[in-house]
Curated annotation (Swiss-Prot):
Negatively regulates transcription of bacterial ribonucleotide reductase nrd genes and operons by binding to NrdR-boxes. Its cofactor is Zn(2+). Belongs to the NrdR family. The keyword Cell inner membrane does not apply. Residues 49-139 form the ATP-cone domain. GO terms for biological process: negative regulation of DNA-templated transcription. The keyword Zinc applies. Keywords: ATP-binding, DNA-binding, Metal-binding, Nucleotide-binding, Repressor, Transcription, Transcription regulation, Zinc, Zinc-finger. This is Transcriptional repressor NrdR. It comes from Shigella flexneri. One of its GO terms (molecular function) is zinc ion binding. The lineage of its organism: Bacteria, Pseudomonadati, Pseudomonadota, Gammaproteobacteria, Enterobacterales.
Length: 149
């Protein structure tokens, strides 16, 4: 790694420690030319698969879109933001675990419904009604009946 002070190429690692619950590494380095010390942080770059929409358009995975959809369903519901973030992280890790470069948007929708069902049944029904395009009250009733099973 280049020294940020003198831009020399030769630096050595003096100390390494895990930080952030083991998700990153903090390294103390020293330049072998100017002897200045500096800290670097190393994290794994986790690449999310691309999303294939129902009309075959491909787009990058958008975490904000996922979050806003879930928050819209959870609006005015008693679910903490920590639980929402854990659900989002669970969905992201499931998508990465597929090992695929592309995933259908339908898969993401199903994963969202799975998480919402665990978090809040009302939010699940709200999301499912839009996602599955419920046409009438009968479809709501059928979905609610499935929840009660």
């Amino acid at each position: 790694m280049h020294c940020p002070f003198c831009f020399a190429v030769d630096t050595k690692v003096i100390d390494s420690r895990l930080v952030g619950e083991g998700s990153s590494v903090r390294r103390r380095r020293q330049c072998l030319v100017c002897n200045e010390r500096f800290t670097t942080f190393e994290v794994a770059e986790l690449v999310m698969p691309r999303v294939v929409k129902s009309n075959d358009v491909r787009e990058p995975f958008n975490e904000e879109k996922l979050r806003s959809g879930m928050l819209r369903a959870l609006e005015k519901r008693p679910v903490s933001s920590d639980y929402v973030e854990m659900a989002i992280n669970h969905i992201k890790s499931q998508l990465r675990a597929t090992g695929e470069r592309e995933v259908p948007s339908k898969m993401i929708g199903n994963l969202v419904m799975e998480q919402l069902k665990k978090l809040d049944k009302v939010a699940y029904i709200r999301f499912a009604s839009v996602y599955r395009s419920f046409e009438d009250i009968k479809e709501f009733g059928e979905e609610i009946a499935r929840l009660e099973d």
